[in-house]
Amino acid sequence: MFALNSRKVSYKNFWILSGLLVFWSCAQIGSPTGGPRDETPPAVVECDPPNYSTRFDARKIQITFDEYIVLNNVNQELIVSPPMDEKPEVKLRKKSIIIEFEEALRTNTTYTFNFGNAIRDLHEGNVLQNYEYVFSTGDILDSMSVKGSLKYAEDLDVPGEPISVMLYTDLRDSVPLTDIPLYVGRTDDSGIFSVNNLRPDVYKVFALKDGNNNLLFDLPTEEIAFLDTSLIVNADFVKQLLGDSIVTPVRAQLSLPSCCRRRPRE
């Protein structure tokens, strides 16, 4: 194992997590022939149970669209946050996505299903980007969010592939060696990431190039970035920084240090 000391190691293998924003907001709930190409992505017309439900206790979700769709690489694109021990089964039925799972859900927890770039219309391949289905097993929906960007420190290039951004309430540097995160997001083509529907808490933030898609830092070829300071996700903390006059969504920009690929200290 390596202990991180950013003053003594080269920037060659470093990433930068930058521009992090913390905010909260209220949750808001046929193929043409001829003429210009249809560039409109599929639209959701119905969800059962409804999106943004509270006191959720179902084991099956149906999301219906206004046209026939296809799922592209859904096992890799779909992010469930908090992660489930067993990935839910996702299948197509006519114009609907069916999600089924048997795993017991955590109490008083907000879950987010983010489909990334998996949902496309059948005929033109238009992508419905980052569609989210959200529910809470409790009485309220958590609405804090974290947004930011990820770049290589040496040349400020963005990663050439999606990178998992992982949040833990366990603040040990070594936690990604043994535990899956409480919340997870993923960078897009511009290195931008967003992790939504968080509960107020203090988090340790990691970015992982996850070679085997298991949300653990367990392969020698995997790369990781991590912050040596904890991230406070709390509406009252944001108000202290920006004042009560700011309307929602409220944002606070935090400075993040460079982080390296080496294994975090035990």
Residue ranges and their predicted role:
Residues 1-42:
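Bacterial Sec-dependent N-terminal signal peptides
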Residues 2-4, 64, 88, 235:
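Juxtamembrane helix-loop transition sites at the ends of transmembrane segments
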Residues 26-197, 202-208, 220-226, 249, ...:
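Acidic, low-complexity Ser/Thr/Gly/Pro-rich repeat segments typical of extracellular/periplasmic
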Residues 214:
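Acidic carboxylate motifs that coordinate Ca2+ or other divalent cations, activating on Asp/Glu
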Residues 217-220, 233:
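Flexible, disordered linker segments and immediate boundary regions flanking tandem C2H2 zinc-finger modules
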Residues 226-235:
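Short, composition-biased linear "edge" segments at structural boundaries
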Residues 236-249:
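Intrinsic N-terminal pre-sequences and regulatory tails
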